[in-house]
């Protein structure tokens, strides 16, 4: 059995990253795939479920896990801590499950150092205007927060060239097709196919 692949997916807020990942998992039942669920010390928001949206833990628990080097990466954001579980991801990959990690460029850098076999994708909006329109359409943030997100988007986008693949989410269906094509191509690489079809290859290569 071949190991799963870790996919690092980054994008500015509003580019459609979460929607594309969710659509991929819902419409691609052929492969075993999961989304990594981060640990966080922030409080649970209405509608969130522990273990689904995040693994909610205390600051003390987070500190202990950090000291045990249980996180592939971790960061502090607005006074709250977030981390990606190393044991969980390694367990899924060893089972042949592809794991998708929704993370910013800084976290992506940390993970690529520790797991160089990971594949990285960056999702771009077609324009600044469209990105701002999407942020406004969500109806979640004030004008001040949207302005800050637009500033953050420029910083995030400036690192797109550090990624293996780039998808422009102008048309959602087309972007989803591109996303699926990347996963399919990675699954067809020689090392993956060799592990999957090892018995067949041995039979084909056996002397008569």
From Swiss-Prot:
Recorded superkingdom: Bacteria
InterPro entries: GK/Ca_channel_bsu (IPR008145), Guanylate_kin-like_dom (IPR008144), Guanylate_kinase (IPR017665), Guanylate_kinase_CS (IPR020590), P-loop_NTPase (IPR027417)
Listed EC numbers: 2.7.4.8
Catalyzed reactions: GMP + ATP = GDP + ADP
UniProt keyword terms in alphabetical order: ATP-binding, Cytoplasm, Kinase, Nucleotide-binding, Transferase
Principal cellular location given in the protein's record: cytoplasm
Any single Pfam family the record assigns to this protein: Guanylate_kin
Domain called Guanylate kinase-like: residue spans: 4-184
Keyword Kinase applies: yes
SUPFAM superfamilies: P-loop containing nucleoside triphosphate hydrolases (SSF52540)
Molecular function as annotated in GO: ATP binding; guanylate kinase activity
Compartments, record wording: Cytoplasm
Binding site residues for ATP: 11-18
Gene Ontology CC terms: cytosol
Family of this protein: Belongs to the guanylate kinase family.
Function: Essential for recycling GMP and indirectly, cGMP.
Protein name: Guanylate kinase
Biological source species: Photobacterium profundum (strain SS9)
């Amino acid at each position: 059995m071949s190991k799963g692949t870790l996919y690092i997916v980054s994008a500015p807020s509003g580019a459609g990253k979460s929607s594309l990942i969710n659509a991929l998992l819902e419409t691609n039942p052929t492969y075993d795939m999961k989304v990594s669920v981060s640990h966080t010390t922030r409080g649970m928001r209405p509608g969130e479920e522990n273990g689904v949206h995040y693994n909610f833990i205390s600051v003390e628990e987070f500190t202990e896990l950090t000291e045990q080097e249980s996180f592939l990466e971790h960061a502090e954001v607005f006074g709250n801590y977030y981390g990606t579980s190393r044991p969980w991801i390694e367990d899924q990959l060893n089972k042949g499950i592809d794991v998708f990690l929704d993370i910013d460029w800084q976290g992506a850098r940390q993970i690529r150092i520790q797991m160089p076999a990971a594949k990285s994708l960056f999702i771009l909006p077609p324009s600044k205007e469209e990105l701002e329109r999407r942020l406004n359409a969500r109806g979640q943030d004030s004008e001040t927060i949207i302005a800050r997100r637009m500033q953050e988007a420029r910083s995030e986008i400036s690192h797109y060239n550090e990624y293996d693949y780039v998808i422009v989410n102008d048309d959602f269906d087309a972007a989803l097709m591109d996303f699926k094509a990347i996963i399919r191509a990675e699954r067809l690489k020689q090392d993956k196919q060799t592990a999957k079809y090892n018995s067949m290859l041995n039979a084909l290569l056996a002397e008569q």
